[in-house]
Curated annotation (Swiss-Prot):
Region of interest: Disordered: 1-154, 211-238
Compositional bias per record (Polar residues), positions renumbered to this chain: 129-152
Secretion signal span: none
Family named by the database record: Belongs to the UPF0328 family.
Organism: Encephalitozoon cuniculi (strain GB-M1)
Name of the protein described by the UniProt record: UPF0328 protein ECU07_0010
Record's compositionally biased regions (Basic and acidic residues): 106-128
Lineage: Eukaryota, Fungi, Fungi incertae sedis, Microsporidia, Unikaryonidae
Disulphide bridges: none
Length: 238
């Protein structure tokens, strides 16, 4: 049986044993540091990815204080740095605030019931009772004696009583009204003298007619004479 041939040492594979070749060369300092095997492992502070993007662009480490936070200008740090504890409970830093003005008590300078036992009627004098306010703008109603005597006669006959409101149009005459013109508003258009005499004549005739209906022709004639002191002239043709 032939003995196995031995290969020269130069022909041996390099990966069989690297310890014989000596220690491996060290990595260059400029080469990036490899990431840790696990993404949960803490990243070393000198790793280039640990720095912020702006710091990497500037190629310098970030300015940090002892707590590890970024430094701020003194003006910004003075205003934005939170104070320890509750800021609302701390005393003011710059001077003392002016003393608050004492709120004026309502009883000071006023007449109270304890100091003045008499009731204060200062505010009640201007108020007027309700029945007076309802009738203060109306004129008092005066009923003439002649109207009272007529009402007593009408009560005996069972007729409705007369009111003291003066009415130019008798109750038994029909007066058509337009829906836009009220009876209490006077007409604004001018009236000629002929129409005025005609209206007076018709009014006197209506008063005479109502006086005869009520059974007192003399009173009807008197009221007609009062309404028309002069005899009507002949109507002019329009």
């Amino acid at each position: 049986m032939a003995a196995p041939t031995q290969l020269p040492e130069t022909a041996k594979p390099k990966h069989s044993n690297q310890s014989e070749a000596g220690p491996a060369p060290l990595a260059s300092p400029t080469a990036p540091m490899p990431r840790p095997a696990s993404h949960l492992a803490p990243m070393p502070s000198d790793h280039p990815d640990f720095r912020s993007k702006s710091a990497r662009l500037r190629c310098q480490p970030p300015r940090t204080n002892n707590c590890g936070t970024f430094k701020q200008p003194p003006s910004v740090a003075a205003t934005s740095r939170p104070k320890p504890g509750n800021p609302f409970l701390q005393p003011p830093t710059k001077g003392t605030p002016p003393p608050k003005k004492k709120k004026k008590n309502h009883t000071e300078g006023c007449h109270t019931h304890e100091a003045n036992p008499e009731p204060n009627t200062k505010h009640t004098e201007t108020e007027s009772p309700k029945p007076q306010t309802s009738t203060q703008h109306h004129t008092p109603i005066t009923i003439p004696s002649s109207l009272l005597s007529q009402n007593t006669q009408r009560e005996k006959r069972g007729l409705p009583l007369l009111t003291s409101r003066p009415s130019t149009i008798p109750a038994n005459t029909y007066q058509p009204q337009s829906p836009h013109i009220h009876s209490h508003t006077p007409l604004q258009r001018p009236i000629s003298t002929a129409l005025l005499h005609q209206n007076l004549h018709i009014r006197a005739r209506n008063i005479r007619h109502t006086g005869r209906l009520h059974g007192s022709p003399t009173k009807g004639a008197q009221t007609a004479q009062q309404a028309q002191p002069h005899p009507p002239k002949q109507l002019a043709t329009l």
